[in-house]
Regions:
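Divalent-metal (often Zn2+) His-rich catalytic cores of metallo-beta-lactamase-fold enzymes
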Residues: 40-52, 337, 353-416, 420-455, ...
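C-terminal motif of bacterial Sec signal peptides marking the signal peptidase cleavage site
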Residues: 18-21
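Active-site metal-binding motif and surrounding structural segment of the metallo-beta-lactamase
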Residues: 153-154, 165-228, 508
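Alpha-helical segment of the N-proximal tetratricopeptide repeat
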Residues: 471-503
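Conserved beta-strand hairpin/beta-sheet module of binuclear metal-dependent hydrolase folds
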Residues: 121-182, 318-322, 326-332
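Feature captures hydrophobic
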Residues: 26-39, 490, 496-502, 506-509, ...
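Metallo-beta-lactamase
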Residues: 130, 155, 160-164, 222, 233-309, 354-366, ...
Length: 680
């Protein structure tokens, strides 16, 4: 394995750069978007306007770009890196690449917020790094780091990355080429997000996992690999990644810019890494789910203290302290950026107050920590620096929580609060709490949602018209869509991009064939993307612009979701819940049906179809059931996925009309991954 020399990236002032158009898209199924005769509107990607250039220049006045502390931290401990890193999947598409980000080796262009550009440059520093004696990280092989802690007979792995098929295996291969072979004695998965568990099958095989029926100490002594996770982990994995998996994956395209080209006018970084990996996800059920809020154990000679932090960045999450190394692993509770209290891909909102409290609790529990490291970005060293890092991070979440509630009690709505609130000046200037991933505006709305829900108490909003109907009514009242477009174009020339995007998107929802509205909306969104400091916001704006111009016709064909490795880890009850979600109630609402479900590898259930609603009862088989079917647990997923071959192979109708069973199978919905978002 060749080693490249560490490249110290210099982050300097903005340099005007020649702008090139985004990669030309393939033919799309969306309405063709052509230039407006009089307005000059067209479907091409645009350079930054002067308003955008000025907005990005103002960032230099806000932040101290001469402060290279984070750059030094990102480089510290570097040991080795490959000359090239470019992992390709089906049809030659990049699954993970650092090579494509070579364009970052210069000053920020007009089309990028210079603060986000710096973050992207630091995330382009990749390879093997030493955190402290005996603790190493492979960074930049995935959006998340894979951490290796040396034990007496091998390695403890902290988090696994996203992809078993691609990134995790490559990271392990690279690590072993530098550090030698060694058995993985334990895997600690810090929380229930796919970029932390999805690579596990690239590190270990299912047959290597310790006996789940054994206590943890016996698992660790067995010679097998223990998989240690926080309380509630398995339930959180399934509910978040399977129940709304289709919608979440579609929205993730916007958050992570998965379909955008790499480049100055495309995707840069999402703050916690360059981008997400969405292929080759694996899942192995944990062997030990922690119960105690704080507990200590010894893993192959390494003392570890676990601190559970539920409801923070994930419903199930935990920090880990290695007292002999004075090294504090903060999972994703600290990440070198302002994180999401609500993630744009969609998930349960997080508890800002609890998040801050668990960080300060970690400070109290582990006051001797001399290095803090985590699942994303780079460590921070030195006892005082560690304390300051934790304090500033906790203070940001606590401020957002407390100030939002103050304004709520003064009668303001979430949208109003988001436009009012601003971080204290000293916190605003801290590089590692900048808004690279989460933002102050959408985090405020998350706090509002947690305490007050969606309703702002204005009864006008109790039963609003759906967007297309509202848009058509509004356009009818306005009377002349052409005149609206003229005014919007004039406002675009004034740099009022948010308003232009809003009003033109209303025109699109009233008439998706309005080509000029699509073009102008895309142009406005593109400028908002160029100005965004949050990588997630930049991606969302640019993907929306892309789809308005091109549709989704050239996106890769979507496989049926919800039947992958993660879904197969569900227990029978959770699978039945998922069946109820996938079942199209309208097709069965006139039917009442009872089914004995005899599972060969789990408890039996009585299923009741009541006006199209699926209810189930454990260990309650009925002699009067309309159907009796037997199958292994995985057969439930054969039904939900509509896989006729597996249905025939796995499922036996023991009693009743097989045609009735087929009716049940035919009621399962087939989700379209590429459902519309920016248009009706």
């Amino acid at each position: 394995m060749k080693k490249k020399q560490m490249r110290m990236l210099l982050v300097t002032g903005i340099l005007a750069a020649a702008l090139t158009a985004c990669g030309s898209p393939e033919k799309s199924s969306a309405p063709a978007v052509s230039a407006g005769t009089d307005t000059g509107l067209n479907a091409e990607s645009k350079p930054a306007t002067q308003y955008t250039i000025d907005a990005n220049q103002q960032v230099y006045a806000l932040l101290d770009f001469a402060d290279t502390t984070e750059l030094e931290n990102a480089n510290r401990g570097f040991l080795a890196a490959p000359d090239t890193l470019d992992l390709r999947g089906e049809e030659g598409r990049a699954v993970w690449t650092q090579d494509a980000y070579a364009f970052l080796d210069k000053d920020a262009p007009d089309t990028a917020n210079p603060s986000l550009w710096r973050n992207a440059q630091l995330n382009h520093i990749y390879g093997l790094f030493e955190v402290t004696d005996g603790i190493y990280q492979v960074r930049g092989y995935d959006i998340a780091n894979i951490t290796f802690v040396r034990s007496e007979h091998g390695w403890i792995v902290m988090d696994c990355g996203s992809s078993s098929r691609y990134t995790a295996g490559e990271a392990l291969k690279f690590f072993r080429s530098e550090m030698g072979d060694g058995r993985i004695v334990a895997v600690v998965v810090s929380h229930a997000h796919v970029d932390h568990y999805g690579g596990i099958e690239g590190l270990i095989a299912p047959e290597e996992v310790a006996d789940r029926s054994l206590p943890l100490d016996e698992q660790l002594a067995s010679g097998k690999t223990a998989i240690i996770v926080p309380k509630g982990y398995a339930d959180a994995v399934m509910k978040e990644n399977v129940f709304v998996g289709t919608a979440m994956k579609r929205r993730a395209f916007f958050q992570y810019g998965s379909m955008l080209p790499y480049g100055e006018q495309g995707r840069l970084s999402v703050g916690i890494g360059l981008t997400a990996v969405q292929n080759g996800v694996g899942y192995i059920a944990p062997s030990y789910e922690a119960a105690e809020p704080v507990f200590e154990t010894t893993i192959d000679g390494v003392r570890a203290i676990f601190q559970q932090t539920p409801g923070t960045e994930s419903p199930a999450e935990m920090n880990t302290y290695f007292p002999d190394s004075k090294a504090l692993w903060m999972a994703e509770n600290c990440s070198g950026t302002m994180h999401n209290l609500y993630t744009l891909r969609g998930a349960e909102v997080r508890d800002a107050n609890g998040w801050a409290r668990y960080i300060t609790e970690a400070q109290s529990l582990f006051p001797d920590a001399e290095v803090v490291f985590q699942a994303h970005n780079w460590p921070h060293w030195g006892k005082e620096n560690v304390s300051e890092y934790l304090t500033n991070t906790a203070a940001v979440y606590k401020f957002i929580h407390d100030q939002t509630l103050l304004y709520i009690n003064e009668g303001y709505t979430s949208t109003e609060i988001a436009s009012m609130i601003q971080l204290p000046e000293d916190l605003e200037k801290v590089w590692y709490t900048r808004q690279y991933y989460g933002t102050l505006k959408h985090n405020v709305k998350a706090v509002y949602q947690k305490y007050m829900g969606w309703y702002d108490a204005n009864p006008i909003h109790l039963d609003e018209l759906e967007p297309s109907e509202y848009a058509k009514k509004l356009v009818a009242y306005l009377g002349d869509a052409g005149r609206v477009l003229e005014m919007a174009r004039a406002d675009y020339e004034k740099g009022e991009y948010q308003w232009v995007a809003q009003i033109t998107n209303t025109l699109v929802f009233a008439d998706p064939e309005n080509r000029e509205a699509r073009c102008l909306c895309a142009d406005a969104l593109e400028q908002l993307g160029y100005q965004a400091e949050s990588g997630a916001w930049r991606n969302a704006y640019l993907v929306a612009a892309f789809e308005l111009r091109n549709g989704t016709g050239q996106y890769p064909k979507a496989a049926k979701l919800g039947v992958g490795t993660t879904a197969q880890g569900m227990d029978a009850q959770t699978m039945l819940d998922y069946m109820g979600i996938v079942m199209d109630t309208e097709k069965l609402q006139d039917r009442s049906l009872t089914i004995n479900l005899k599972l060969t590898d789990a408890d039996d259930y009585l299923l009741k179809l009541h006006h199209g609603v699926l209810l189930y009862y454990k260990d309650a088989l009925s002699d009067d059931a309309d159907l009796t079917i037997s199958m292994p647990r995985i057969g439930i997923l054969a039904i939900t996925s509509g896989n006729q071959e597996k249905i025939e192979k796995l499922i036996t109708v023991e009693k009743g009309d097989a045609a009735l069973f087929q009716t049940l199978c035919d009621s399962m919905a087939a989700f379209d991954l590429y459902f519309n978002i920016i248009e009706p």
